[in-house]
């Protein structure tokens, strides 16, 4: 579970957000949604503990995993070694990863369908492949709460769909609690049980996804008309949010 009460963040003289409060139950997925520059990443990092709040409190129950928006590696590590880094909390500061840690890392790669990446260099991977590796590293930590910052940022449609389907499957199988930041309403619609709309410093709306992701709310959030369209594909009907560029 995640509990945030009256959270505020200030950078120098600029207030980024304030009076943010919500609770996310165990096993639920929530999205922090809004245009660029509304403080989504800052809020997520504050909840994770990477940035200090100016006021308020955060409680996270369970071991956490975190996938950043940008994952640069100073050295050209092999994929398996990067995933093993996710075992750091279990290994501790004064010993090296053991056979069991490598076994868990390999099993995680296999589960995500990227076991063939194990001996490849991270720097030689595509953007989508790198994101899969970082998700594997987080999952190898055996986390109960997973935080993701723009998990499909800068990826093409194929890799966006790949990552979203993977996350949906893993969440269902493991019962993870997930909080992710995104600027794409369709991704929140696909994954989230609950959504926070980041309108401004003082205005955030929180509630069930079906109540937050309405045409009226999204037009107010983005300043662009949005329509919800029913689409049938392979015998299934899904509602899809579509911006209207007119």
Label each residue range with its predicted role.
Residues 48:
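Helix-to-loop junction immediately C-terminal to a conserved catalytic motif
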Residues 121-125, 129:
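Conserved ABC ATPase signature
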Residues 33-35:
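The feature captures the beta-strand-to-loop junction immediately N-terminal to the Walker
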Residues 182-183:
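H-loop/switch region of ABC-family ATPase nucleotide-binding domains
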Residues 222-246:
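ABC ATPase nucleotide-binding domains
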Residues 84, 99-117, 142:
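Conserved ABC ATPase "signature" region
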Residues 146-150:
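Catalytic Walker B motif of ABC-type/P-loop ATPase nucleotide-binding domains
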């Amino acid at each position: 579970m995640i509990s945030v009460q009256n959270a505020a963040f200030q950078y120098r003289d600029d207030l980024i957000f304030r009076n943010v409060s919500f609770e996310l139950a165990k096993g639920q997925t929530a999205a922090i949604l809004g245009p660029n520059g509304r403080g989504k990443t800052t809020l997520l990092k504050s909840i994770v503990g990477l940035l200090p709040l100016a006021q308020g409190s955060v409680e996270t129950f369970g071991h956490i995993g975190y996938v950043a928006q940008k994952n640069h590696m100073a050295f050209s590590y092999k994929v398996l070694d990067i995933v093993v880094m996710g075992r750091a909390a279990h290994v501790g500061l004064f010993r090296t990863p053991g056979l069991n840690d490598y076994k868990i890392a390999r099993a995680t790669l296999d589960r995500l369908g990227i076991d063939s990446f194990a001996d490849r260099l991270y720097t030689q991977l595509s953007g989508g492949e790198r994101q899969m590796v970082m998700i594997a590293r987080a999952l190898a930590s055996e986390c109960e709460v997973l935080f993701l910052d723009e998990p499909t940022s800068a990826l093409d449609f194929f890799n966006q769909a790949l990552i979203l389907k993977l996350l949906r499957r893993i969440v269902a199988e493991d019962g993870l609690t997930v909080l992710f930041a995104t600027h794409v309403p369709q991704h929140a619609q696909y994954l989230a049980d609950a959504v926070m709309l980041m309108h401004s410093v003082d205005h955030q709306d929180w509630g069930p996804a079906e109540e937050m992701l309405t045409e009226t709310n999204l037009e107010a959030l983005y300043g662009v008309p949005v329509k919800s369209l029913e689409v049938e594909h392979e015998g299934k009907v899904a509602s899809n949010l579509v911006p209207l560029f007119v």
